[in-house]
Amino acid sequence: MKFVVRSIAFATLAMCAFGAFAQKGETVKIAYIDPLTGLLGPVGNNGLRGFQFFAEKFNKTNPAGVKFEVVAFDNKLSPAESLNALKAATDQGIRYITQGNGSGVAGAIIEAVNKHNERNPGKEIIFLNYAAVDPDFTNSKCSYWHFRYDADTSMKMEGLTTFMKDRPETKKVFLLNQNYSHGHQVAKFFKEGISRKRPDIQIVGEDLHPLGQVRDFAPYIAKIKASGADSIVTGNWGSDLQLFVKAANEGGFTGNFYTYYTSVTGTPTALGKTGEGRVFQIGNGHARMGGEMDKWQDEYKAKLNDDFYTGQIINIYTTLSEAMAKSKSTDPVKVAAALSGMKTKSVFNGEIEVRKTDHQLQQALFITVWGKVDKKYSYSMENTGMTMIPVKQYPNYVSSTPTSCQMKRPA
């Protein structure tokens, strides 16, 4: 497996050639709207620390010479609270918005951003979606002002079902997901993908549960074991995966997990030494990508006593600063035009592209498996002595999925 690694310094030198420092020293505020309290608060706080940590890194050297400042808003995982936070942010003159936890929230923000920009010409805002993966956001509900940096569910499930196709031991699957758009889409795209690639696999059960409300998953585990499932497919994240895994361990489920978010706060600790070789994740990276990424990951842990697992944050700062350099402006209208269709090199994930047709980032994806740290994959997640070890890489031309987006662009 070969990873393409480039430093921010390289990007800086490249952009200097374009006379990119027109905005040097200008402060660019980014409103971070995510849950900072409640059961899913630990995930939101991890994301906030990631944005703040890499703001400091990029403030030292970025091709536009701007200074990034992150302003946090606790949305309590509520669409209504998120819209209040968005209003507060725009009232403060903040014109860049980011959010990632909960597609229900992201959908509300997209609609609100569209309305704001229609009603307030000259005060446009951009939504930098770092983790909400409902495919509709870059298909039927696509927006010129929305840019998604995580791979959407259709992309992730295309990779995951391709991987599962070649695992003959997987014969009976139970789907357990959160009862909102993301969970619905995980189930939908799994069924579509596996029926094409492994029609012999049986779906022996399916359940949905309230987002961020269940504290005891033992009844779900009992149902899964009774179904005869040898594998679970879940898009759960945060406490909903952490507590689910805990219940599986306590309930004696010894089958495979196919997940999106095993790396996310709390789940590594819940897994501990269990699950070796049978808990899989699809994502845009892993714990030892090489080069500068390894250095940053270790520094992040030493400074914050936390794991960094959201590489999308780095790609946001990379593309945003390059777009500001290219447009010689921090005006969202000019920056959006520069972002749309941008191709560049990620610090950790090779060639990436902000696809012009729908603003979905095109990037490589990896299948990883829970296993013991070793010399090559030495990063201990949540100090468990375990890590996510890469077993398969899908280049961006493989992970890419088509779009039906008919984007309305500014005149």
Where are these regions (language model features)?
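Signal peptide-proximal N-terminal region
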Residues: K24-G25, L48-V70, S195-D200
